[in-house]
């Protein structure tokens, strides 16, 4: 039943975005989303942002979908709302319908991209720059014990509050990986500023057959992107897995409070760590879970000339990571480039300034861990 409702809502959204209508000075007119900034316009329509072309016409798809798919009851009073599991960010990921619905939302963007012309060899090629090889350390995943302080979520009496010795910790097993480095050997015939894009994706399907590149392109995840200055001749670019635009495990409130108080007493220096963002992709999830015998994946590295983005940052880096600001760009190339469009001819995709490298991800058995995992 819920799957049917999800498809119905998604179908209505598809009809709405097929012929975008914008309102200006009370006059409605159609908008061609296949022109410049059309992808952003499509995102505004689906997300129902304040700057959407016509909020009253398109409505709030995701908000309504969460209410309908979550079987939320209509509140009898504005202050007596009973939100469903899907309407809580903390619990939405536990409902299978969440993934079905957002897979459909993602499909709209992929469908949009499928109507754009494929990249030509000339567009992808960077004359004079060649990636000779990519060397990657051994990749290992494992589950470790992650402990976090939940004291603030519990009620304590005045005596316990004054003593400040009442602590409750929760322990959870989370996927992690052994930090690794990779080296990119690049030959350049000139001094030039470039942008490296590093992707990781599967190679074989569940039957052990190699996945065609055009079908497999949506499975590649960009986990690193950085600007680098190439010198004339051979360049060895070394990069660590901790250097990407990812988020490390957060410092607990108690630990942060203790550091601040110690700094105020002159017992230690308090350093503002700007690398600790409140939102972003967790660094511990860079690698998918491997197998004990090893699971084959593919590294893909692409080099393009560096061109400064026209979007200037509009957020304060001290208090925000800039997620959702629309200004976190290294250059003007689209997200996921060059996998964002259909690959019509594979021979035009394999340019000298790109490189596929097979890697094997191993998973460390639980019995080899420092702390064995109890069975629940």
What are these regions (language model features)?
Residues 2-18:
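Cleavable N-terminal signal peptides of Sec/SRP-targeted secreted and luminal proteins
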Residues 19-376:
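Intrinsically disordered, flexible peripheral segments
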